[in-house]
Each structure stands twice: as structure tokens, then as C-alpha cells.
Amino acid sequence: MEGSSNSNSRGFNTSGVSDRNTEFLPVERLTTRSKPSSHVDEYVRSLFGSTSTHKSGEDDSLGIDPFVRSLEWGDVSLRQWLDKPERSVDVFECLHVFRQIVEIVNAAHSQGIVVHNVRPSCFVMSSFNHVSFIESASCSDSGSDSLEDGPISQKEIGSSRREEAVSKAIAIEEKGVYNKLLERKIEKLEEEKTQPFPMKHILAMETSWYTSPEEDFGSSSTCASDVYRLGVLLFELFCPVPSREEKSRTMSSLRHRVLPPQILLKCPKEASFCLWLLHPEPTCRPSMSDLLQSEFITEPRDNLEEREAAIELRDRIEEQESLLEFLLLIQQRKQESAYRLQDTVSLLSSDIEQVVKRQLILKKRGSSLSDFSKDDHQYTSGQPLMSFQANEEPSAFLASRKRVRQGILALENGVEVDEESQGSTLLESSRLMRNFKKLESVYFLTRRRQMKAAASGKSLTRHSPLSSENGRGSMIVSEKSSVSNPVAPKAFFNNDSRQGGWIDPFLEGLCRYLSFSQLRVKADLKQGDLLNSSNLVCALAFDREGELFATAGVNKKIKIFECNSIVNDNRDIHYPVVELAGRSKLSSLCWNSYIKSQIASSNFDGVVQIWDVARSQLVTEMKEHKKRVWSIDISSADPTLLASGSDDGTVKLWSINQGVSIGTIKTKANVCCVQFPSDSGRSLAFGSADHKVYYYDLRNPKIPLCTMIGHSKTVSYVKFVDSSTLVSSSTDNTLKLWDLSMSASGINESPLHSFTGHTNLKNFVGLSVSDGYIATGSETNEVFVYHKAFPMPVMSYMFNNTDSMSGLEVDDASQFISSICWRGQSSTLVAANSNGNIKILEMMT
């Protein structure tokens, strides 16, 4: 083998791989897996510069040969990997790398080829520690020296094969790969300055390190020389050196087979094997077959297999642990949910028991009434008239409650109740069950607030959004007093059994929510100028008695109508009792609650006007605003005080008697609405185009008492529901209910409710409040009514437009409700749309 090595010796520079620099352009990988023997022989000879020729078909097969692998992004030079400062010696890893290189060299030697360039700079490692052969510039230089010893014909053949391989490599390379590798080269050059082993210096010394003793004395390279180089490589694998100077000293000592003490102590077996490979006499070095059959090579393979099996077992255990952790986490969360559910069920059971006890007390106190005399035997037996069993379905409970309620009302009125009527349930009415989830969430919200208030020693009833102001019951009645209490006198409901706790506010809210189900048209306001294109109604307002209501809009007129005459008289055209003409489009109206005939208006020119309706004349004009005034309000507690909000970013306070402003609040955005609370003239709320609601104490107008943040678009309306609760409307499609008593910090970002169901994205659609009921318009041409207790609509009504030519009702998607107003504390309201249609509506059961 050695005797024939001289003529066949080739450096890797003469293989089928072109010259490469240290940045490792595309490579060919040598291995011996799944390759037919004859093909392996010819391929290896081609790679190492054999003089044998290939058939064209075999040449073409090299591109897909399993031995060939293109350089992948992330591959690193074995030299760079060895010289990493942070590299620690992993025995299995080092032996795995060494064994791969031994197999590469053995493949060459089996064909009588001396590899010559068994040096770290001529190999690359993948991210999976897979070693592949490449050729660097240093390999070419050193290889050229060795070629001078060989015949010229062999050199020419090698050059020919190199050119052939270069053309193939260029053909298969993508332009983008070259660009990436070029960028990587630049980065490497920049990093060279900071590296402890600059590549240029290392490559210059590497050739001398890996030169065998016989080559130093002028002998040609042999297979034994490759074995010597393997010994040097094995030493570098197991003996990392931290500094450049120490590296030079260590490698110089290695020439004399002097090993550092640390490798002798830590790796005696590897050190002994290394000295065998580095023997100065070539004949005393092991052959490649001896290497491959040695325990040093074979035993690590067995150990590696055991290690891989152990790793696989560990991975499977970790997978099981991950699954176990996942299942335990699910169990923990489900247990937490079960605990919460258990607490919820316990809370519900306690509340049911409390309600049943209250029911018994109420019915015992009312046993003298004829309504309950027929059911006295139920109370004496200790059973309530209606109790909810744990195993009873909610729908069945609701059905039985409905039947009992209908039966009681029918017996009171002396009417027989048929079975079919008794069989109707709240489920069939669908409102309760359709909104069951929302009602449930409000119930739990009420309970949480009650428990929190109880913990802090506060009362829920006074400020609860579910209860009426000051704990009073509903004051709202229909025009014919259709909403009545058939059960007991008022004094009966003011007894101790209905005071405090969560039951009263939630029950009141639920009853109020279920009291009405629809809006009915009581009357249509028919005007003579219906064909006028400028009929948009911007404002509606009732006087203090609810007898007169005023309309105003873009037609620059204030029209006063008598409500009862419109409801009772079926006329083709309704004429206003008073009509006041302005000079500009009108935006807002407000009656004086103290002076019956006095009404205030604002217009698009920024003027606030006071009118005397009885004399049909203008009393006062106030012109201090610089831009359009959107909203005005006269204080009920101080009827001489008026507030106005304008596009000029100011809120002005006016003395009606003096006709001048007495105060100004400046803001950074347009003011769209203002509102006094009904019981005070010392505070004021207004909404702004900056999406916020501001609440001021007018005795300190420099800073707001509270800022309510929650809307995402312009706040178009604000109305006080009661002295401590405020509702705001925005063009973000929502109404929000705010508790002013929860704003001790000056910022309130948590509304009690967000009412959704209507559509409001760009227009002013109106807002009005009456005893807990909140009416608003929608850009779908509908009127929506909410109750402050729940976030979903109680009812809605769709306006149908009348065609001016045919008189028929038609749908017009461009129309929207533009204004709305309750008639005092009644179930009646008046609404107008953008087409000028005005309807008087009434809530019905």
C-alpha cells in the first residue's frame, strides 16, 4: 500500500472540488453508507484525483450521490470549532468527530490514495456534529507543494478534473447562496480581530503542526503520514488551549511527543492512543485497519449506542413527565373551577333560602288580604307558595311561577283562568331566557358588590344601579295608570323585610326590566311641511308638567305642541300652539323647570337664546361662544343658572337674569353635551370629543372632580340617572353607566354597565332618562329602551318612513333617530328621526 502511494498520492486540492477559501463554499461529503462497492471505488478515486476515468453516466450521478452534500447555512469549520474559547471536552462528542474523519481517511486508503490534507481547516461540522470534507485556500497551497513530487501528467489530470468539478459546482449554486456566504465572510473578517486565534495565523502554523517527521526529512507523504496527522487531530480534540501563545508551545512540544500533564491525568487512555499514532517511526504507527479494529474506536461506538439509548429513554421519561404535568395542570384548574362552582352553588342555595324566608314573611303578613287567604294552609305547613327545588329545571320553575302569578291576578279580578293561559311561561315570552346569561352576570356582579360593600361597611342600596334613588320604588306610571300594584299598600313594601341586602335592588331591577315588553305608537305628529327637505329634528323637550313639548332643528324653528291634543285628536295635520323663528339652525332645547313659559335654545352660530313662549318672543341672546353650541341645560335646583357646551372647547355658565356668562371651563376638545344633576346647581357633567366624560364641582372649576374614561369615540350625550349615577352616550355604539361615588381617585375607568344593542357610529341619536329607564336612538331608525339594571335592551321600535308621494310606509336605511325625550316620569316618550317624522310612543306590557 505504501509502495504504491507515491504515484497515487493526491492532496484534497486535486480532488473534484475547486479551490475554496476558509469560508467554505459548496462542498462534497465523503462517506461509505449505502453505496455499491464498485461505485464507491470509482467515486473515491475521482474525489482524490485518481487517474481512472469515469463514464458520463457515472459523472452525472455524482450530483445525487448519497456521499455528496452541499454546504448548509450554519456549518462551521472544524478548525474554528476546535479553537472556540468556550469549548469544553465532551469525550463522546470528540470520539464521534474523530471516528468520522478516520472513516473518511480509510475510504481513501482503501483505494491506495494518500489523503495528505488531514487537517481541521479542511473539514466542516454541521449543527448535528456531522463532519464533511471541504478544501480551503491553505489546503490548496500546501497541496500544491506536495504535487511537485508527483508526475506532471498526474498534476494535469488533477487540474482537468478540478476544472470539471468547478463548472459543475457553479452550475448548481444559487446566486443567493453566494451572496449569503459573501456576507458571512465579511462578518468573519470583522470578527477575526476579536478572536483569540486569528484564522490566518492558525492556518499558517497548521501546516507545520500536521507535517509528519518523515516529511520534514524530505520523504514523500504516505498512508502512515495520514495516521500521524490523525494523532495530531486527536490531540487537538482532547486538549483545548485557551491562548494563542500556549497553543504554539503545546503544539511544538507535541512534535517531540510531549503531552501536557492535564491530558495525561484526565484522559490517560486517549493520551496513550495519541502517542501511538504520533510514533516517529512510520512503521510503528498503526494501519487504518488496526485503528478501526481497536477498542479505542469500537468501544465508544458501543458506548455511544448505549448513551443514545439512555438519551432516548430519558427523552421518553421527560415526555411522560410533560404529559403528567399537563394533566396535573388541567386537574388543578378544574379543581379550582369546581371549588368556585361549589362556592357559587353554596351562594345560590343561601340566596334561595333567603328569598324563600322573605317570601314566607311577606305572605304571612299579607294573610289577611283576600289575595292570600286561599293559600293560608300552605304557610301553616311551613311550605312557601313557590320554592325552587335543587333538581328542578329553571324553565319548569319559571313556568310554575308564571302560572301562579297569573292565577293570583285572575282570582283577584274574578276571572276564570283556563289551562292554556296558565300554561304560558316566561320561556315562551323568550325575553328572560334569551338574556339569561346577561341576567346571570348582573346577578353575580350585584352579589360581589354587595359582599364588597358589606366588607367595607357601606350600603349597596343607596348607590346601586339596580335600585331607584334613595331606595324608592318605581315612580313611572302609564298615561292611564296601567302599571299598578295589585298586592299590597305602599307602606307594606316599606317594611323591614324588603330593606338592605342584595335582594331589593336586584329584584327591583328584574321586575322593572320585565314590566314592559314593547313600544306602541300612541300618535303620529303630522305636520304641513312634511315635504320640506330640511326637517331634521335636532332637539325635543317636554315642559315641567309634560303638557307641552317643543321641537327644533335645521329648519330654524321652535315648534311647541300640546301633547294630549295630538294623542286624542285624530287630525290630518297637527299645528303647533306656538312657533318661534330663529336665524340659524337649532341644536338644543331646554325648558325652565321654574318658569313654565320659558325655554332656552342654542344654534349653529354659537348663540344661546332665552324665549318667552307665552308671549312668543325672544327675551335674551347670549353670544360669547365663538363656534357652534351643541348643548344647553338649565339647572332644576337653580333655575337662573344655564350651562352651554360648544365646539370652541368651552363650557360657559350663564345667569339667565343677567344675560351674561358668570364662569367658563376651558377644555382641549369640542364639548358636545352638558347636564346638571336634578338636585344640585353646584355640579355639572359634560361629554367631550376626546372620548371622556368630565364631572365638575362648580365651586372649583379649575380641575374636574372626576374624569370618566371608557368610550373609544366622541361622547355625544350625558344624562343623570340619579344624583350619583350618570349615563353617557358615544358614537362607539355604546351607552355607559357610571357611579360617581366610586370616583374617589378622580379617575373612573370602570363603568357599571356598557349598554349595547343599538347602532351609533357617526350621528347624534338622542338620549333621555326617566326613573331608571334609558331611551336612545339608533342609526337603524329604531328607538331602544334600556333599564339601568341590565346591559341589554328592554324593547325597541322601528320607525317606518312614509313616502311623500304615495303615502305608503317604506324602509330607508339612510334614516336615523335624531332626538328622543321622555314625558316626565311616565311610560310615554316622543321620538323624531332625520326625516322629520315624530311619534309619541308608550311602553306596554
Swiss-Prot record:
It is found in: Nucleus. Induction: Up-regulated by red, far-red and blue light. GO terms for molecular function: ATP binding; identical protein binding; protein kinase activity. WD repeats lie at residues 532-571, 581-621, 624-664, 666-706, 710-748, 757-796, 812-845. Residues 1-33, 139-158 are annotated as: Disordered. Keywords: Coiled coil, Nucleotide-binding, Nucleus, Phytochrome signaling pathway, Repeat, Transferase, Ubl conjugation pathway, WD repeat. GO terms for cellular component: nucleus. Residues 301-329 form a coiled coil. Residues 1-297 form the Protein kinase domain. Gene3D superfamilies: Transferase(Phosphotransferase) domain 1 (1.10.510.10), YVTN repeat-like/Quinoprotein amine dehydrogenase (2.130.10.10). Residues 1-19 have a biased composition (Polar residues). The keyword Nucleus applies. GO terms for biological process: photomorphogenesis; red, far-red light phototransduction. Repressor of photomorphogenesis in the light. Probably part of the COP1/SPA E3 ubiquitin-protein ligase complex. This is Protein SPA1-RELATED 3. The gene is SPA3.
